[in-house]
């Protein structure tokens, strides 16, 4: 008796894009998605005001977020910087037939994500301290004290125990970082 061929679409990996504030995670993710239409991005749900700007996210109130937690909507959720963040279970639908699904995660939740997602990789985006300082000051979302706190956290190491981690330096031209990240993603697929 022969076993029928598996015709289900392949599931792409979940690719966490991590790094300190101002390093260019969202710009890198956008550039990668433009370069490869099968590389998808997952929007985070955040208890941040909609007018805060920056990344593309789904803003919700604290009460709405808690209701989503209780309804088991999230594959992963965490607290950071006085806000709550969630990755909806819909990420699994995005993985079907995808090169991968990019998601902006906090370094503190990476080990948990590695347990939640069966095919999980990390791209750690870095930049020189002076580049981070200029970018944080330029975006105007944080006051001077918060910029200093974020710069102090920029050098924090990733947690030990992650299986697939790759570093991309985004100190220079964004296009160079995109090419570097594309090469990493393609090499992982080979």
Swiss-Prot record:
ATP binds at residues 19-26. The keyword Transferase applies. One of its GO terms (cellular component) is cytosol. GO terms for molecular function: ATP binding; ribose 1,5-bisphosphate phosphokinase activity. One of its GO terms (biological process) is organic phosphonate metabolic process. Disulfide bonds: none annotated. SUPFAM superfamilies: P-loop containing nucleoside triphosphate hydrolases (SSF52540). Coiled coil: none annotated. The keyword Chloroplast does not apply. Pathway: Metabolic intermediate biosynthesis; 5-phospho-alpha-D-ribose 1-diphosphate biosynthesis; 5-phospho-alpha-D-ribose 1-diphosphate from D-ribose 5-phosphate (route II): step 3/3. Its EC number is 2.7.4.23. It comes from the Bacteria. It catalyses: alpha-D-ribose 1,5-bisphosphate + ATP = 5-phospho-alpha-D-ribose 1-diphosphate + ADP. HAMAP family: PhnN (MF_00836). Catalyzes the phosphorylation of ribose 1,5-bisphosphate to 5-phospho-D-ribosyl alpha-1-diphosphate (PRPP). Belongs to the ribose 1,5-bisphosphokinase family. This is Ribose 1,5-bisphosphate phosphokinase PhnN. It comes from Ruegeria sp. (strain TM1040). The lineage of its organism: Bacteria, Pseudomonadati, Pseudomonadota, Alphaproteobacteria, Rhodobacterales.
């Amino acid at each position: 008796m022969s076993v029928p061929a598996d015709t289900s679409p392949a599931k792409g990996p979940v690719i966490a894009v991590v790094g300190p504030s101002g390093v260019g995670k969202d710009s890198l993710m956008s550039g990668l998605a433009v370069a490869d239409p099968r590389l998808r991005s997952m929007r985070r749900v955040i208890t941040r005001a909609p007018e805060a700007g920056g990344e593309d996210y789904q803003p919700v109130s604290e009460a709405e977020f808690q209701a989503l937690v209780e309804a088991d909507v999230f594959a992963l959720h965490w607290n950071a910087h006085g806000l709550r963040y969630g990755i909806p279970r819909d990420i699994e639908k995005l993985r079907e037939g995808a090169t991968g699904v990019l998601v902006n995660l906090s370094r503190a939740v990476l080990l948990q994500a590695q347990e939640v997602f069966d095919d999980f990789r990390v791209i750690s985006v870095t930049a020189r301290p002076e580049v981070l300082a200029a970018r944080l000051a330029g975006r105007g979302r944080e006051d001077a004290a918060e910029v200093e706190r974020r710069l102090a956290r920029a050098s924090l190491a990733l947690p030990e125990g992650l299986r697939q981690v790759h570093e991309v330096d985004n100190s220079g031209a964004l296009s160079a970082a995109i090419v570097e990240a594309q090469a990493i993603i393609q090499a992982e697929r080979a």
